[in-house]
């Protein structure tokens, strides 16, 4: 799990630099504050590592994730099939998809940030040390910084342009000839397979075999939509006699292949460095729209350099004493109390339009918020996955009744505005739409050059799975919820 720290610590530091140091450097030059922030971020990563070692992450990897991906493919194909019917032409594919598998975070656009806030707020109660979790100011700052970054990351990752770029990058990586000698490449591949096999041996993956990844790959590469009556006998013979053995071997291959990808990210130095650089670059690019980021970049750099120059000289014992004895709120309460909260009044939501009852008071360029708007009752973010069906009503309680239980009279009207699907395209395309179409065609061309794989997974099916921003958001929020429920089982039993 030490590999996880090397991946997450730079990301946490970058988030703190953007959402905390950018505004704090303008009101104070306290060198102890950023040191405490770095310690809190390190404690969060350390606690997350301990939970990953204690909890059964194999359930998440070999059941929850492939289950959600299978449901995503099935619902997408079902929505496309219903859209092809004459009575389905009046609805969009995303609307049909939403009716098949609704997600509470996508009922309204305002719900997405509220969903991330509630999720991070409940997680921080178990990740922060006891002394730090008592500070309301500290919890609010960390909640807003992490929630906004998660929200922005999902917004960027779910866009079709990002998916097309990922397809192009992956296609070029597969087609690019290896610079290593073939013997070294084979040795490296065998080493990654051995790492993956060793992980399977020390977990429940072997005695409790999961065929979920095999079912996912079978669903992904399957091109036959239905089976004719003449093939029923053949399929019955196949599924009763041959399928269990094929599924057993294929499940082992699928699990090993999936773990090889994860092991490569953690153990391959080049891939690890490229992955961290990509994440940090993405986080920096998300903050380019910050109007105050450019004017404060120099102050933030100087502030961090000044604070970190004296911080490494302190021993680990002193750091633990400092963390356990003082929280961020106790360090400089006068600084926080002097922040003019009413200088930028929060925007009021129009409840008549079915928006959420929690006011989004966080300004993306400033991490200081009004403490009166902090949710005092823990409410857990859920979707309709098997792990979280019991707690959906908790988050629904934050949504007005017009959204949570629409009447039959305004069902069609509410579905047009009740969840954040992209707007209908117009006849005249904008330059961004033209660039998206060009990028889409480039992704299709690059993918078509890959050997063998396009034969089993046609490009039109691949594009259908990634072309919708709403459906991409749906799968990301569902994966986030499943990760939370598996790593934090305490949330299932909280009322």
Swiss-Prot record:
The chain crosses the membrane at residues 7-27, 235-255, 446-466. It is a multi-pass membrane protein. GO terms for cellular component: cytoplasm; cytosol; endosome; endosome membrane. Residues 402-419, 427-436 have a biased composition (Polar residues). It comes from the Eukaryota. InterPro entries: Phox_assoc. It is found in: Endosome membrane. Residues 1-174 form the PXA domain. One of its GO terms (biological process) is protein transport. Residues 402-436 are annotated as: Disordered. Its main location: membrane. The keyword Transmembrane applies. Required for required for normal vacuolar morphology and for vacuolar protein transport. Also required for endosome-to-Golgi protein transport. This is PXA domain protein 1. It comes from Schizosaccharomyces pombe (strain 972 / ATCC 24843) (Fission yeast).
């Amino acid at each position: 799990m030490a590999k996880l720290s090397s991946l997450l610590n730079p990301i946490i530091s970058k988030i703190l630099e953007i959402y905390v140091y950018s505004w704090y450097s303008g009101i104070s030059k306290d060198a102890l504050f950023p040191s405490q922030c770095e310690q809190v971020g390190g404690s969060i990563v350390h606690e997350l590592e301990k939970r990953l070692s204690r909890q059964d992450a194999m359930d998440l990897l070999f059941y929850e994730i492939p289950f959600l991906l299978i449901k995503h493919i099935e619902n997408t194909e079902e929505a496309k099939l219903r859209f092809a019917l004459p009575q389905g032409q009046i609805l969009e594919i995303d609307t049909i998809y939403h009716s098949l598998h609704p997600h509470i975070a996508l009922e309204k656009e305002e719900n997405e940030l509220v969903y991330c806030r509630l999720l991070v707020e409940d997680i921080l109660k178990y990740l922060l040390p006891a002394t730090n979790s008592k500070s309301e100011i500290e919890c609010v700052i960390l909640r807003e910084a992490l929630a906004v970054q998660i929200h922005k990351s999902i917004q960027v990752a779910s866009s079709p342009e990002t998916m097309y770029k990922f397809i192009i990058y992956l296609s070029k990586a597969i087609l690019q000839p290896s610079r290593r000698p073939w013997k070294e490449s084979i040795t490296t591949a065998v080493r990654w397979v051995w790492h993956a096999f060793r992980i399977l041996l020390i977990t429940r993956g072997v005695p409790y075999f999961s065929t979920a990844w095999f079912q996912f790959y079978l669903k992904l590469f399957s091109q036959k939509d239905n089976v004719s009556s003449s093939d029923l006998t053949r399929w019955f013979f196949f599924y009763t006699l041959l399928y269990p053995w094929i599924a057993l071997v294929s499940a082992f291959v699928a699990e090993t292949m999936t773990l090889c990808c994860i092991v490569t990210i953690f153990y391959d130095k080049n891939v690890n460095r490229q992955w961290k650089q990509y994440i940090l670059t993405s986080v920096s690019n998300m903050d380019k729209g910050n109007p105050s980021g450019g004017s404060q970049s120099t102050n933030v750099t100087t502030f961090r350099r000044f604070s970190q120059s004296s911080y490494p000289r302190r021993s680990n014992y002193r750091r633990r004493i400092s963390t356990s004895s003082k929280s961020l709120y106790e360090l400089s309460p006068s600084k926080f109390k002097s922040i003019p909260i009413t200088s930028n009044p929060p925007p009021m939501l129009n409840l008549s339009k079915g928006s959420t009852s929690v006011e989004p008071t966080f300004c993306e360029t400033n991490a200081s918020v009004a403490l009166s708007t902090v949710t005092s009752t823990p409410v857990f973010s859920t979707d309709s996955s098997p792990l979280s069906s019991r707690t959906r009503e908790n988050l629904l309680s934050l949504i007005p009744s017009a959204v949570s239980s629409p009447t039959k009279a305004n069902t069609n009207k509410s579905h047009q505005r009740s969840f954040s699907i992209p707007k209908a395209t117009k006849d005249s395309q904008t330059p961004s739409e033209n660039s998206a179409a060009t990028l889409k065609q480039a992704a299709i061309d690059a993918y078509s050059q890959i050997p063998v794989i396009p034969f089993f997974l046609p490009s039109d099916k691949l594009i259908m799975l990634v072309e919708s921003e709403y459906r991409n958001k749906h799968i990301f929020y569902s994966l986030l919820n499943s990760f939370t429920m598996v790593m934090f089982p305490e949330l299932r039993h909280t009322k």
